[in-house]
Amino acid sequence: MKIVVDGMGGDYSPHIVVKGCIEAIKEYNNIDIIITGPEKLINDELQKYEYNKEKITVLDAKDVITNNEHPVMAIRRKKESSIYKALQMMKNKEADAVISAGSTGAFLAGATLVVGRIKGVSRPALAPIMPGKNGPFMIIDCGANAECKPSNLVQFAKMGEIYFENILNVKNPTVGLINIGSEEEKGNELTKEAHKLLKDMDFNFVGNVEPRDIPTGNTNVLVCDGFVGNTVLKMYEGVASTIFETLKDEIMSSFRTKIGGLLLKPVFKKFKKDYDYKEYGGAAFLGVDGICIKAHGSSDDKAFKNAIKQAINFYENGIIDKIKSHIEQKMI
């Protein structure tokens, strides 16, 4: 399996990207990695490590797309950028998966324009796996489509169900619609119409899910438009960060609380690990005709290694072909 990684994507590129790739090839011997970016800069980073040099190659890309640029215009103009060249390899069947921690807008726009959608998919959707109290869950869409039709949400649900069932090995995962109330008649026109369609599909549909119930993880696949999904995602990350920081401040506030914190250290350590996004790698961009994983902008080497693991699972489980099969059978 060949995986192409955007070497200039993320807050700590290229050194963290390179480190994550090297850790991945040491753990997974069935992959080869191509890193896109300024050749000298990437090679200088690679020289800091001992590794099998046959497993990692560099594709020179002199340009970088930043978060401040207009995504579509940047993709169209900067064809020497690390993101564009990575996606072009996928388009040309020179790679089996693409991973980037760079500009989300540019990556999603590029995946849609360069790689292209699966025939029959109206809108690709971003689908991160999130940590929950009773197990991980997925939110789809998380920012690719701010405005949607009810039929889009039905496709999101099916693609999410296929991915969740195969990647997390959960048979017949539950599917819920994020809404302001659990009652069927609650919500706006989008959610009301989507609810009608979803309950008639072959999903394990559990109905509307209120935001307060999202963190439980009781519902496996949570469906919404990209505006709602991105808002929930960022709030979730912010709340988790605030809780950790507040606990840390309180524990360090006195000698007595420091002793208590020391006794509870194993509990806090497990809690932090369970709610660490690095454990889940990145968000799959479902609906494009190739494996595209969007890693978090602040990903460290562990997160990159796990994003690569995620791409391997995606490939080995044949998710793209399974989505295509459902579409051909007019099941979504």
Swiss-Prot record:
Location, primary (coarse class): cytoplasm
Catalytic activity entry: a fatty acyl-[ACP] + phosphate = an acyl phosphate + holo-[ACP]
Keyword Lipid biosynthesis: yes
GO molecular function, one term: phosphate:acyl-[acyl carrier protein] acyltransferase activity
One GO term (biological process): fatty acid biosynthetic process
UniProt pathway annotation: Lipid metabolism; phospholipid metabolism
This enzyme's EC code(s): 2.3.1.274
Keyword annotations of the record: Cytoplasm, Lipid biosynthesis, Lipid metabolism, Phospholipid biosynthesis, Phospholipid metabolism, Transferase
Highest taxon of source: Bacteria
Location relative to the cell: Cytoplasm
Enzyme superclass (EC): transferase
Pfam family, one: FA_synthesis
Gene Ontology cellular component terms for the protein in this record: cytoplasm
InterPro entries per UniProt: FA_synthesis (IPR003664), Phospholipid_synth_PlsX-like (IPR012281)
Function recorded in the entry: Catalyzes the reversible formation of acyl-phosphate (acyl-PO(4)) from acyl-[acyl-carrier-protein] (acyl-ACP). This enzyme utilizes acyl-ACP as fatty acyl donor, but not acyl-CoA.
Family: Belongs to the PlsX family.
Quaternary structure annotation from Swiss-Prot or TrEMBL: Homodimer. Probably interacts with PlsY.
Identification of the protein by name: Phosphate acyltransferase
Gene encoding the protein: plsX
